[in-house]
Amino acid sequence: MPPQLQNGLNLSAKVVQGSLDSLPQAVRKFLENNAELCQPDHIHICDGSEEENGRLLGQMEEEGILRRLKKYDNCWLALTDPRDVARIGSKTVIVTQEQRDTVPIPKTGLSQLGRWMSEEDFEKALNARFPGCMKGRTMYVIPFSMGPLGSPLSKIGIELTDSPYVVASMRIMTRMGTPVLEALGDGEFVKCLHSVGCPLPLQKPLVNNWPCNPELTLIAHLPDRREIISFGSGYGGNSLLGKKCFALRMASRLAKEEGWLAEHMLILGITNPEGEKKYLAAAFPSACGKTNLAMMNPSLPGWKVECVGDDIAWMKFDAQGHLRAINPENGFFGVAPGTSVKTNPNAIKTIQKNTIFTNVAETSDGGVYWEGIDEPLASGVTITSWKNKEWSPEDGEPCAHPNSRFCTPASQCPIIDAAWESPEGVPIEGIIFGGRRPAGVPLVYEALSWQHGVFVGAAMRSEATAAAEHKGKIIMHDPFAMRPFFGYNFGKYLAHWLSMAQHPAAKLPKIFHVNWFRKDKEGKFLWPGFGENSRVLEWMFNRIDGKAGAKLTPIGYIPKEDALNLKGLGHINVMELFSISKEFWEKEVEDIEKYLEDQVNADLPCEIEREILALKQRISQM
């Protein structure tokens, strides 16, 4: 941020909504400093009201940023510049004094566990980008709460942005507006600054009326100063700073300091036919089915799944030793392709109104369309692709971008959990890790202990996804599904997880690993997935209660024969689904050991080294 300026600045920007005098002093100072730096024409303090939202949506429609989808109620479509479609790991940095605070120093090459930038380089980058970057535009002031307003687990942020798309999306994804300022008072807040980096008048014409500045895109986190600064991208993960930037990168660092966990996890409630309920949290990399699992329709009669959150969990042990979790978000920012009545009926019901779609295709009758939507088109209805061109299946390219999104209010989900906004959070009894593994990894196994479970999280690997800019089908290490989101050194993060076992009175959740994606020799999935995954959750539920049978294997406990309820399923090759090959696991543990030794190096906790050795030994005795 620029040098602290005197209070009561003579701002050239005109305040068009709200009043500077109504702001807490620290918020006002933050706003004035950055208005001086970015030089917007107008300042708009967001109140979060319906009326304000309607006005902004109408304004974006006039400017061609959004199109109204007339088939649904208050739904909108944004098509971005094709250069601004995903999170960009290579341009996302954490700024600390010492590199080792941010990433372990790897043995060879570059760290894959985050990108560090020095304070000097960041100051240069800031000064090359932000002065005058909002000329001709409005600076919106967004007061937002991550988590239910007033929950002891919640945190408040203020985002300054020149993008009305960000304002409308943040209103869905967070609790936003005047009530947040009232709750904040003189309290602490995370300072978020965002600009699309396109001052007016424009130097070159926009693509799709979507302002962005891909050449200069930078997303920076300054954990010591509680600041997030993002430039040049309008895409959700880079511009909705409450999401990954605050709720994971910044929050994981706060959690380390304050003794809690901020994780890339869904939270679901599952109730058995007897009416007993448990809450589980699950970490999968992006596009591995977190949203589908969180909103599952169980195929097992009498079982019920309810959704607390589909992406992020903030968890803290309470005085009784229960791990309590809240969903810090207020909406779902879900990947659209592959979402259908078959794969996720509850998501389809959620997105029928008050939803902003980005980079999906549009039908000529004012609806949305994407790969895997599985809905026949009415005769005569045509499709316009996310590239704004007439589209037909013969074109040989997808109609929707693989990372196209829906941004929709969580309260609209038909199976939202009754306690989803409970200020004290819900008690987590099981933690699930998982990834997309076509070979070698069984459908489900249970960790042998908390320490072993932390190792299982550290060893997570998955086929690459569309949510980041990587292409192709390679198996990537994605520890805890947090690889793109660590806010500090991953070795210290592992030590923090291990330290939870020292918490007095802690009732440690059981830890499981799942793989819905194992394939047979013909390349067909061995497990039907989706609602049938409730059968795996049933086994976990009963394991937590000490009821279900399990068989000890070198990698953990797997269901005993007949312990997994397969009633009503066609033929399932259980042998192949649960087979554990010595050859595969020798290679797997070698890859994991090499990765952790290389990437975490001197910061790898000795408990994790012990788990690697113990696993090697168990495999050698197979």
From Swiss-Prot:
Phosphoserine found at: 19, 90, 118, 286
Record-listed Phosphothreonine modification sites: 178
Alphabetical UniProt keywords: Acetylation, Cytoplasm, Decarboxylase, Endoplasmic reticulum, Gluconeogenesis, GTP-binding, Kinase, Lyase, Manganese, Metal-binding, Nucleotide-binding, Phosphoprotein, Transferase, Ubl conjugation
One annotated GO molecular function: manganese ion binding
Binding site for GTP: 287-292, 405, 436, 530-533
Chief location of this protein within or outside the cell: cytoplasm
A biological process term (GO) from this entry: glycerol biosynthetic process from pyruvate
Domain of life per record: Eukaryota
Pathway named in the protein's UniProt entry: Carbohydrate biosynthesis; gluconeogenesis
Reported modifications of this chain: Acetylated. Lysine acetylation by p300/EP300 is increased on high glucose conditions. Lysine acetylation promotes ubiquitination by UBR5. Acetylation is enhanced in the presence of BAG6. Deacetylated by SIRT2. Deacetylation of Lys-91 is carried out by SIRT1 and depends on PCK1 phosphorylation levels. Phosphorylated in a GSK3B-mediated pathway; phosphorylation affects the efficiency of SIRT1-mediated deacetylation, and regulates PCK1 ubiquitination and degradation. Phosphorylation at Ser-90 by AKT1 reduces the binding affinity to oxaloacetate and promotes the protein kinase activity: phosphorylated PCK1 translocates to the endoplasmic reticulum, where it phosphorylates INSIG1 and INSIG2.
Catalysed reactions, as listed in the record: oxaloacetate + GTP = phosphoenolpyruvate + GDP + CO2; L-seryl-[protein] + GTP = O-phospho-L-seryl-[protein] + GDP + H(+)
GO CC annotation terms, alphabetical: cytosol; endoplasmic reticulum
Cofactor dependency: Mn(2+)
Function: Cytosolic phosphoenolpyruvate carboxykinase that catalyzes the reversible decarboxylation and phosphorylation of oxaloacetate (OAA) and acts as the rate-limiting enzyme in gluconeogenesis. Regulates cataplerosis and anaplerosis, the processes that control the levels of metabolic intermediates in the citric acid cycle. At low glucose levels, it catalyzes the cataplerotic conversion of oxaloacetate to phosphoenolpyruvate (PEP), the rate-limiting step in the metabolic pathway that produces glucose from lactate and other precursors derived from the citric acid cycle.
Miscellaneous information on this protein: In eukaryotes there are two isozymes: a cytoplasmic one and a mitochondrial one.
HAMAP family linked to this entry: PEPCK_GTP (MF_00452)
Protein name: Phosphoenolpyruvate carboxykinase, cytosolic [GTP]
Gene that encodes it: PCK1
